[in-house]
Amino acid sequence: MIKGYKEKVKIHDGHGYVYKFDNGFGASVVKHSGSYGSEKGLYEIAVLDSDGDLCYSTPITDDVIGYANEDKVLDTLHRIKSL
């Protein structure tokens, strides 16, 4: 499992999780009717900066990551935690 602060949130008609890591980065993992992949039961991931805002300037991605299965979510969370 990923160590770091995690908060479950209700978002639109679905749910999400906000992660915060010791390196100052975090992640938003969501599944709702407007997220990329929700129609297939998949997640959308965003990298967050230390203020909790979307961060588009990491080696991981310059956008959100859609259509992520659970393995992709876990891999991406590990990568964010290791930045």
Language model features with spans:
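Catalytic phosphate/metal-binding cores of nucleic-acid and nucleotide-processing enzymes, i.e., regions
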Residues: 1-83
